[in-house]
Swiss-Prot record:
Subunit text: Monomer.
Name of this chain's protein: 3-phosphoshikimate 1-carboxyvinyltransferase
E.C. no: 2.5.1.19
Listed HAMAP family: EPSP_synth
Pathway(s): Metabolic intermediate biosynthesis; chorismate biosynthesis; chorismate from D-erythrose 4-phosphate and phosphoenolpyruvate: step 6/7
Binding of 3-phosphoshikimate, residues: K21, S22, R26, S166, Q168, D314, K341
Example of a GO biological process term: amino acid biosynthetic process
GO molecular function, one term: 3-phosphoshikimate 1-carboxyvinyltransferase activity
Organism: Syntrophomonas wolfei subsp. wolfei (strain DSM 2245B / Goettingen)
Length: 428
């Protein structure tokens, strides 16, 4: 539980957010597939990414942790050992889905399990296409929900149109495709984060990307490499919005990943009237990186849907906070995927912001918010066990009148362990 009072002064300073969760997951998993030592600098030491490390260690991969650096001693595409126990993915959907793709072709039995939240998340979206490739995966409720029981099998490539825009599904199929006996062609309905494609390209995989199509040919051994993980734009988003809504604020957020497939939050906030500038733009380990300068502004309402949704799907809860304090009516459509995240994020953010005085109405695939500056009041709100809901409500509390209490606040450790310390530093 955390008590948060209205911000009494502008947020000013030079900050760095925790490392990118998506890239950290992929870096450690792909490194396990490359023979030799890979080095991952600025690896995110959070509950979700450590679940991936734990699963890989149970599969025989040596991973040495040195401060924020990980040294991974990969054993090749076929170098894994049969686990002696169930592989615990914790709360991490990325761990479970990517590991399912990796394990589908391994010549042994493995079982993937998660916590109560993860075991309610849909898995048929990976089980069906992996099954077409030849995978043998069983799951609860007619193949819908974890635990997953995987009996390794010989896989064939496939040509597949993804029914949902999901980078986790795409990445699971790409991992399976590395061990298939023929080429795989994947087509996305909308562009999703492309960290897997960039990383596999850098590691020497035979992969070609053309718009929404990905073509991957098996047979090439991945090369061990060194990664430097940038700051997570999804974590930076909380401070982008905080600086935008607290009068007089100006923050410099250093070393943030600004991959175009993830940077929808910057574009949409700027369209709302935010003042976010990118400086010192560079490319590090194949990923675009920049320093962000964010200062206070009066925000205007906006409607979002379509192709931008996958590019800011994780940022929609904090975007709802910005919309609640913007002038006018905002609408989010096409975001039904939020209902099957760690919690039903549409219901969670709608219910909890309403407790703080927001005029918000749920839709099946989003919400409508009638925003008004200075409209929020303090209250007792719940994270629903979801890290992004907790951090979004914390930012809302800074702009609300009076004290707020956030229940189950330590859930931020899933993705951003330093969140509360950083927030306290900026507001003390």
């Amino acid at each position: 539980m955390r008590k948060i009072n209205s911000a009494l002064k502008p947020l000013k300073g030079d900050v760095s957010v925790d490392a990118d969760k998506s890239i950290s997951h992929r870096a450690v998993i792909f490194s396990a597939l490359a023979p030799g030592k890979s080095i991952i600098k600025n690896f995110l030491q959070a509950n979700d990414t450590l679940s991936s490390c734990s699963c890989l260690r149970q599969l025989g991969i040596k991973i040495a942790a040195m401060d924020s650096e990980m040294q991974v001693y990969g054993r090749g595409l076929s170098g894994f050992s049969e686990p002696h126990t169930v592989l615990d993915c914790g709360n991490s959907g990325t761990t479970m889905r990517l590991m399912a793709g990796l394990l589908s072709a391994q010549p042994f039995l493995s079982i993937l399990n998660g916590d109560e939240s993860l075991n309610q998340r849909p898995m048929k979206r990976i089980i069906e296409p992996l099954g077409i490739m030849g995978a043998n995966i069983q799951a609860r409720q007619n193949g819908n929900y974890p635990p997953l029981v995987i009996r390794g099998n010989r896989l064939s490539g496939l040509s597949y149109q993804l029914p949902v825009a999901s980078a986790q599904v795409k990445s699971a199929l790409m991992l399976a495709a590395l061990n298939a006996d023929s080429e795989t062609l994947l087509s996305e309905p909308q562009k999703t984060r492309d960290h897997s494609e960039r990383m596999l390209t850098a590691m020497g995989a035979d992969i070609a990307v053309n718009g929404l199509e990905i073509r991957l040919k098996p047979g090439k051994e991945l090369q061990a490499t060194e990664f430097l993980v940038p700051g997570d734009i999804s974590s930076a988003a909380f401070f982008m919005v905080a600086a935008s809504i607290i009068p007089g604020s100006e923050l410099l957020i250093r070393h943030v990943g600004v991959n175009p497939s993830r940077a929808g939050i910057i574009e949409i906030l700027n369209e709302m009237g935010a003042r976010i500038k990118l400086e010192n733009e560079r490319t590090i380990s194949g990923e675009p990186v920049a320093d962000l300068i964010v200062s206070h502004s009066r925000l205007q309402a906006i409607d979002i849907d379509g192709a931008v949704i996958p590019r800011l799907i994780d940022e929609i809860p904090i975007l709802a906070v910005a919309m609640a304090l913007a002038e006018g009516e905002s609408t989010v459509r096409g975001a039904a995927e939020l209902r099957v995240k760690e919690t039903d994020r549409i219901a969670a953010i709608s219910t909890e912001l309403a407790k703080m005085g927001a005029d918000i109405r749920e839709r099946s695939d989003g919400f409508v918010i009638k925003g008004k500056p200075d409209s929020l009041k303090g209250g007792r709100v719940a994270s629903k066990g979801d890290h992004r809901i907790a951090m979004s409500l914390a930012v809302a509390a800074l702009a609300a009148k009076g004290e707020s209490v956030i229940e189950d606040s330590e859930v931020v450790n899933i993705s951003f362990p330093r969140f509360w310390d950083l927030l306290n530093t900026l507001t003390s």
